[in-house]
Design a protein with these regions (language model features):
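Aromatic-flanked redox-active Cys/Sec active sites in thiol-based oxidoreductases
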Residues: 91-97, 126
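Thiol/disulfide oxidoreductase modules built on the thioredoxin-like
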Residues: 138-144, 150-201, 205-218
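C-type cytochrome heme c attachment motif
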Residues: 95-102, 167
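Hydrophobic beta-strand anchors of alpha/beta hydrolase catalytic cores
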Residues: 89-90, 121
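Active-site acidic short loop of glycosyltransferases
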Residues: 84-85, 116, 143, 162
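A short beta-strand-turn-helix
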Residues: 67-88
């Protein structure tokens, strides 16, 4: 029996179709080669390089905790609820924190500048020995318009969602958290938020100036 194979005519007819499929595949491969890196880059860029100042803290717009905390250098204690009716700046700091040392002059300057405006500044010692915190203030200086308090067992820090320092929160006259700075504060940043709040406007809710520092292991 004679085996019948494909005719030369049918083979020739299949060649253009095969070439069309090959060209189509190459064209789509070229498109994907261009699109995929852009898409992946955009995805990772959105996740890794997005501006954290545009991401609001979930605490913004929420009432601040009313926990009572003891003063660092004097007898007695205070609660943030004692300061209702005033704009309040709450700064979490520690003597072992490098960025806290960097921002300290700016906080002191802001406390002095906004004293007549009735702004209260609270410095909350975070996971630090009182003696070390006092030594820090002896070296770096204190502001008269500042209340320095301790935070036993970090309960106030937990209420504010603090896991490292420095972090600074701004409370409006109703005791609501209006804004937050993560990382070292600067005088322009502090003034920008306070000027907006004192004028009755909504400040930038969340600004990130750098990483925070966790407490060292003892």
């Amino acid at each position: 029996m004679t085996e019948v194979g494909p005719s030369s005519e049918s083979t020739d007819a299949a060649k253009p179709a095969s070439r069309r499929r090959l060209r189509r595949w190459l064209r789509w491969s070229a498109v994907l080669a261009l699109v995929l890196p852009v898409g992946v880059g955009a995805l990772f860029g959105a996740r890794l390089d997005r501006d954290p100042s545009l991401v609001s803290s979930p605490l913004i717009g929420q009432p601040a905790a009313e926990r009572t905390v003891p003063y660092l250098e004097q007898d007695g204690a205070m609660s943030l609820s004692d300061l209702r009716g005033q704009v309040v700046v709450v700064n979490f700091w520690a003597s072992w924190c490098v960025a806290c040392r960097e921002e300290h002059p700016a906080l002191n300057a802001a406390a002095a500048a906004y004293r007549d405006a009735g702004v209260e500044f609270i410095g909350v010692v975070y996971q630090d020995r009182p003696s070390s915190a006092i030594a820090f203030l002896d070296e770096m200086g204190r502001s008269e318009n500042y209340r320095y308090v301790t935070d036993p067992e970090s309960r106030l820090a937990i209420d504010f969602g603090v896991f490292g320092v420095p972090e600074t929160f701004f409370l409006d006259e109703t005791g609501t958290i209006a804004a937050k700075i993560t990382g070292a504060s600067t005088l322009p940043l502090l003034s920008g938020v306070l000027d907006e709040m004192l004028a009755g406007r909504t400040p930038t809710p969340s600004t990130n100036t750098g990483p925070v520092q966790e407490a060292p292991d003892e």
